[in-house]
Design a protein with these regions (language model features):
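Negatively charged, low-complexity tracts enriched in Asp/Glu with abundant Ser/Thr
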Residues: 1-25
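Membrane-proximal basic amphipathic "stem/tether" segments
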Residues: 82-85
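Acidic, low-complexity, intrinsically disordered interaction modules
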Residues: 15, 21-79
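Short intrinsically disordered terminal tails
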Residues: 1-3, 93-99
């Protein structure tokens, strides 16, 4: 998998911030972030939405992460069609501009 620098979005106590991580493309919608390429990364294995920078799911290991993603795939597809998703994309783009 091709590695890239990706800015993930954290919302802590209602405050947005971005953190650069090394990510790999998992599929057309999602980046995979692992602790092996991000030593100080707070979450174990994670998948992030490419357009919003938001976390989709996590796992204790890569297999659990894949299993968890398979469980939420249908719901995630519905979210991508929602008005809220478009709002999250705009917010993410604004955060990147402000940095």
């Amino acid at each position: 998998m091709k590695k890239t620098i990706f800015k993930i979005r954290h919302i802590v106590d209602g405050v947005d911030s971005l953190q650069e991580v090394i990510a790999e493309e998992y599929d057309e919608f999602v980046y995979y972030v692992s602790p092996t390429t991000n030593k100080d990364f707070k979450f174990k294995y994670s998948l992030y939405d490419k357009k919003t920078g938001l976390m989709i799911c996590t796992g204790k290991n890569k297999q659990e992460l894949i299993d968890n993603y398979n469980k939420v795939t249908e719901r995630y597809a519905q979210v991508r069609k929602s008005a809220h998703y478009k709002k999250y994309i705009k917010e993410y783009e604004q955060l990147k501009k402000e940095e």
